[in-house]
């Protein structure tokens, strides 16, 4: 998108009050049964924002009981027309759009996310995803099947029931919507556990669900699930061939790693560059990383915020030290930044080899590692030599090479001459240890429905 086409970004709200800090069950706010609370912090300043009620087993039981009750045959939720269900989900999208500035400010304060990214990318994505799911609500249907014999056979797509949904801290609002949008569209009820580091936007959305005013259930809690879809971690390969548009590859690979301080499951964290362009690619990547301005993510002009918390911050610094000790060349960064908040300098390593910790472990931080390859077969083998398989990138002007490599890579998503492009229309999920099942798109709806086959004996079929 060109700068001239960028929408205006408002100024973040100041003196934000966090009024929703309780557990939301059966359209009502509750204190925890135990009386326990936990603090929620701003990772840029380390200040406490508020305290949130801490859900425990008894709270979970209450939430699941309420969600089961709402799913009973004959309940208002089960007897509601599918088109009305879609209208309610669209209404929730309207309310999120209304509160977009508030939610973006909250997401930035609680999660360390750049305000501009929260406002444009995260909130924009949430609204589009909900509207996409709303459109599916009255289009989830079965088929008639020409079974042998005098039978009439059809299938029904039925909701599976109560869905337990656990939200990660790196994209708390986006992941909440990815979970509840398709689940509710299919007619399920949900029990949601936001991440303890970033619960505030989920709790605000609960208040909007109450405002919508229908039988949609949410709560902070855990559930034992009989059926599981998991979108887990990754150590995603990004392969740059010598015939690629070098500047475009540098920029996409850079954003593929450094977006949201590297705290993305799809981060392009194993960067393979063909030998003949390796040195130039490293040079341009280092120049790009050095342009960052670090600081409070609510401040205009800042383009890198803090890591989520102290634990993650220390883990990343430890992995950076391992890279230095194991012989990778530190090109820039390599340490903490500032005297307050969990900031880490944008870091680039070259001369990285496959056996180093930084090449094998998911860092989840602003640490780019650039490796060299010589041949097509070699890089495919190395790219697939991992327990993960969430995503991958390929940069080449050769369409035959792009198709060959994308077919060979063991990844749920492969981007060619781009990286990190996601849409509500397209399925997302991983191979191997990066999870099972899919989210988004029509495939994502399948995770929230059961197929029932109904066969009726008839006197004579007329086929």
Name what the model sees in each region.
Residues 208, 212-353, 382, 416, ...:
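ALDH superfamily catalytic-core signature
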Residues 49-140:
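Glycine-rich loop-to-alpha-helix module at the N-terminal edge of alpha/beta enzyme cores
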Residues 46, 85, 107, 187, ...:
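Residue-level signal for inorganic ion chemistry
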Residues 141-248, 373:
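Rossmann-like NAD(P) dinucleotide-binding subdomain of oxidoreductase/dehydrogenase enzymes
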Residues 31-32, 37-38, 54-58, 244:
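A short acidic/small-residue loop/turn micro-motif
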Residues 45-51, 293, 320, 325, ...:
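Conserved C-terminal structural/oligomerization subdomain of aldehyde/semialdehyde dehydrogenase
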Residues 1-45, 70:
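Hydrophobic face of amphipathic alpha-helices that form TPR/SEL1-like repeat modules
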Residues 48-55, 72-76, 165, 238-241, ...:
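Short, well-ordered beta-strand elements within core beta-sheets of diverse protein domains
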């Amino acid at each position: 998108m060109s700068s001239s086409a960028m929408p205006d970004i408002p100024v973040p709200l100041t003196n934000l009050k966090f009024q929703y800090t309780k557990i939301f069950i059966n359209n009502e706010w509750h204190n925890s049964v135990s009386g326990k609370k936990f603090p929620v912090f701003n990772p840029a300043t380390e200040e406490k924002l508020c305290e949130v009620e801490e859900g425990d087993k008894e709270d979970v039981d209450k939430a699941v009981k309420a969600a089961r009750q709402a799913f009973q045959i004959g309940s208002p939720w089960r007897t509601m027309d599918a088109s009305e269900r879609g209208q309610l989900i669209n209404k929730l999208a309207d309310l999120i759009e209304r509160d977009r500035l508030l939610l973006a400010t909250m997401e930035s304060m609680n999660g360390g996310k750049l305000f501009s990214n929260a406002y444009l990318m995260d909130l924009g994505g949430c609204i589009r995803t909900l509207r996409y799911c709303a459109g599916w609500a009255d289009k989830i249907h079965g088929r008639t099947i020409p079974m042998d014999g005098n039978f009439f056979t059809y299938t029904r797509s039925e909701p599976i029931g109560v869905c337990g949904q656990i939200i990660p801290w790196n994209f708390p609002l986006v992941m909440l919507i990815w979970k509840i949008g398709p689940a509710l569209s299919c007619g399920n009820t949900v029990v949601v556990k936001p991440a303890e580091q970033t619960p505030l936007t989920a709790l605000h959305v609960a208040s909007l669900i109450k405002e919508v005013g229908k039988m949609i259930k949410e709560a902070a809690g855990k559930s034992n699930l009989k059926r599981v879809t998991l979108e887990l971690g990754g150590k995603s390969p990004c392969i740059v061939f010598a015939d690629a548009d070098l500047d475009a590859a540098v920029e996409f690979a850079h954003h593929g790693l450094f977006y949201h301080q590297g705290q993305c499951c799809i981060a392009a964290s194993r960067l393979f560059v063909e030998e003949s362009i390796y040195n130039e690619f490293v040079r341009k990547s280092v120049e790009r990383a050095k342009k960052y301005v670090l600081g409070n993510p609510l401040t205009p002009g800042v383009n890198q915020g803090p890591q989520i918390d102290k634990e993650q911050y220390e883990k990343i610094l430890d992995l950076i030290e391992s890279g230095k000790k194991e012989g990778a060349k530190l090109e820039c960064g390599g340490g903490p930044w500032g005297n307050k908040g969990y900031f880490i300098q944008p870091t680039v390593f070259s001369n990285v080899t496959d056996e180093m910790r930084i090449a094998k472990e998911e860092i989840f931080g602003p640490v780019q590692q650039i490796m060299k390859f010589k041949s097509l077969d070699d890089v495919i083998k190395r790219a697939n030599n991992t327990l993960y398989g969430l995503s991958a990138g390929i940069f080449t002007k050769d369409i035959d090479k792009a198709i060959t490599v994308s077919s060979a890579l063991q990844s749920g998503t492969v981007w060619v001459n781009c990286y990190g492009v996601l849409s509500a229309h397209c399925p997302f999920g991983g191979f191997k240890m990066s999870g099972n099942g899919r989210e988004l798109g029509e495939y994502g709806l399948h995770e929230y429905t059961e197929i029932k086959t109904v066969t009726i004996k008839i006197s004579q079929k007329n086929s």
